[in-house]
Regions:
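Short aromatic/hydrophobic "clamp" motif used to bind/position activated sugar donors
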Residues: 2
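The conserved acidic donor/metal-binding loop of glycosyltransferases
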Residues: 6-10
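Conserved donor NDP-sugar-binding/catalytic core segment of glycosyltransferases
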Residues: 13-46
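Short, flexible, basic/aromatic active-site loop/helix in glycosyltransferases
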Residues: 51-84
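A short, conserved alpha-helix in the catalytic core of glycosyltransferases
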Residues: 84-135
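Active-site-adjacent helix/loop segment of glycosyltransferases
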Residues: 123-202
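Membrane-interface aromatic/basic loop that binds lipid-linked glycans or pyrophosphate carriers
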Residues: 201-225
Length: 225
């Protein structure tokens, strides 16, 4: 077994042993995540839907969840659920599956590498599972909020990583359409947000340069890798 665990997480005592024991007896579960709580005890919903035409904006994502029966309320009520992807802050999988998948995609500096791994797993018919009877505390986002410079960098990288994911998993017109919709939706948010926030203004400036290179040169990589 291999466990990828964020350093800002706390596992329940001995929970890993019982989780592995259960997983050894239920071999259909191949990429495994667990329930993640924040420091206040609230569920962080550390899973989601793949990025596509129906999930690329928040408005469309809500209707997609309802249509597919994948609302947080429904999925959190189940002991085991099967989201598209699980958070990379806790991923348990067998070593041979990790090798079969080719490991983590190092084109991502941060963010979306978990979605990418799960997408490749689904493409190989490997089941992605979320277990609610095991849990950890994840101090989510604490490291990215230490100062304004880190905040701007991390939020910019989230947007860049979304474009990298699109470039990795879509081709031709589909890729161009998704890139364009993502640019439009993020631009609207950042431009209007810039009126009241210097942080959003700085993020927009960085993203604008990135978008220009992407559209004109087809360059959708992160300069952090």
């Amino acid at each position: 077994w291999l466990l990828f665990l964020n350093p800002d997480t706390i596992l329940d005592s001995n929970s890993l042993f019982s989780l592995i024991k259960y997983s050894n007896s239920n071999k259909e579960h191949r990429l495994i995540g667990i329930k993640q709580l924040n420091q206040n005890g609230s569920d962080t919903n550390a899973y989601g839907l793949f990025l596509d035409i129906w999930t690329i904006t928040g408005f469309l994502r809500i209707f997609n969840r309802i249509f597919r029966g994948l609302t947080y309320k429904k999925m959190n009520a189940e002991e085991i659920s099967f989201p598209d992807w699980i958070s990379g802050s806790f991923v348990l999988l067998r070593k041979f599956d990790f090798i079969k998948l080719g490991g983590w995609n190092e084109k991502y500096w941060m963010y979306y590498e978990d979605m990418d791994l799960c997408k490749r797993a689904k493409d190989l018919n490997l089941k992605v599972s979320l277990f609610k009877n095991w849990k950890c505390i994840h101090f989510h986002g604490e490291s990215s909020r230490k100062n304004k410079t880190i905040t701007v960098m991390s939020k910019t990288e989230v947007i860049k990583s979304a474009h990298i994911y699109i470039q990795n998993h879509y081709k031709n017109l589909s890729a161009l359409s998704l890139h364009s919709i993502l640019i439009l939706s993020r631009s609207i948010d950042l431009i209007f947000g810039s009126i009241f926030s210097t942080l959003k203004r700085k993020i927009f400036v960085k993203c604008f340069k990135y978008w220009k290179n992407g559209l004109l040169k087809g360059y959708w990589s992160s300069n952090k890798v």
